[in-house]
């Protein structure tokens, strides 16, 4: 039933878009699409790289970074972590790849997107830069964020950026099965919150019921 509802929901923008589309009147973004802003107040650009930083300071702060997962047999670093404080190393740069990229280079709230670590790597490790949600971890009681995802595919790699109820933004994981038919949706019934759990003394990004991670975005110069 939920899948049927989601399909109906996703068809609405298709009807709206197709009714106004001609070769002389190209598809435009929904009128209520709100650009995601970085800490400088500039709109995020899919061609640029950003660090995902905390909206808090001190022990409550810390950038997001790529690191080695405990007990992982992956040939490359594949864990997504957050530093234990904002005093220390900078996070690993990322870029955001929107599912509606044919509308332009902007990144918008509630838009389905992929997240990729923007780093130089070997050919072997290229696929270990794209975010996804891994299998259920029984010891932690949740699913952990890791790399090894796929850009533009309906698997475990779709996320959203939404405005936080407190400060900055939240990240959501949205396991939809029909991606391009519904690039924008403010209905988060089908999305799960991204937060932090503690794994071997580190803060690991994971799916949570409460206390989602509040983040901001800082452009890498």
UniProtKB/Swiss-Prot annotation:
InterPro entries per record: Kunitz_inhibitor_STI-like_sf (IPR011065), Prot_inh_Kunz-lg (IPR002160)
Signal peptide: 1-22
A GO MF term: serine-type endopeptidase inhibitor activity
A UniProt-annotated Pfam family: Kunitz_legume
Site feature (Reactive bond for trypsin) residues: 95-96
UniProt motif (Vacuolar targeting signal) ranges: 25-30
Site features described as Reactive bond for chymotrypsin, chain residue numbers: 143-144
Keyword list, A-Z: Allergen, Disulfide bond, Protease inhibitor, Serine protease inhibitor, Signal, Vacuole
Prosequence residues removed at maturation: 23-28
Subcellular location: Vacuole
UniProt note on tissues of expression: Tubers. Not detected in root, stem, leaves or flower bud.
Gene3D superfamilies documented for this protein: 2.80.10.50
GO-annotated cellular components: vacuole
Induction summary: Not induced by sucrose, methyl jasmonate or wounding.
UniProt keyword Signal, yes or no: yes
Intrachain S-S bonds: 76-125, 174-191
Keyword Flavoprotein attached: no
Miscellaneous notes: Has a single chain structure.
General function of this protein: Inhibitor of trypsin (serine protease). May protect the plant by inhibiting proteases of invading organisms.
Cross-referenced PANTHER family: KUNITZ TRYPSIN INHIBITOR 2, SERINE PROTEASE INHIBITOR 5
Family indicated by similarity: Belongs to the protease inhibitor I3 (leguminous Kunitz-type inhibitor) family.
Protein name per UniProt: Serine protease inhibitor 7
């Amino acid at each position: 039933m939920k899948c049927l509802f989601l399909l109906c929901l996703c068809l609405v923008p298709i009807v709206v878009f197709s009714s106004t589309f001609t070769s002389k009147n190209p598809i435009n973004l929904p009128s209520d699409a709100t650009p995601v802003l970085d800490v400088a107040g500039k709109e995020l650009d899919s061609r640029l790289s950003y660090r995902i930083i905390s909206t808090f300071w001190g022990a409550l702060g810390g950038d997001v970074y790529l690191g080695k997962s405990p007990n992982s047999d992956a040939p490359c670093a594949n864990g997504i972590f957050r530093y234990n404080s904002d005093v220390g190393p900078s996070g690993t740069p990322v870029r955001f790849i929107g599912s509606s990229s044919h509308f332009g280079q902007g990144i918008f709230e509630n838009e389905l997107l992929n997240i990729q670590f923007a780093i130089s790597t070997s050919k072997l490790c290229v696929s270990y830069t794209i975010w996804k949600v891994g299998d259920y971890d029984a010891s932690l009681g949740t699913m952990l964020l890791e790399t090894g995802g796929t850009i533009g595919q309906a698997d475990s790699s779709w996320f959203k950026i939404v405005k936080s109820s407190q400060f900055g933004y939240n990240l959501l994981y949205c396991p939809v099965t029909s991606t391009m038919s519904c690039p924008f949706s403010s209905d988060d019934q089908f999305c799960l919150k991204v937060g932090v759990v503690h794994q071997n003394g580190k803060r690991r990004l994971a799916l949570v019921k409460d206390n989602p991670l509040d983040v901001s975005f800082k452009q890498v110069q």
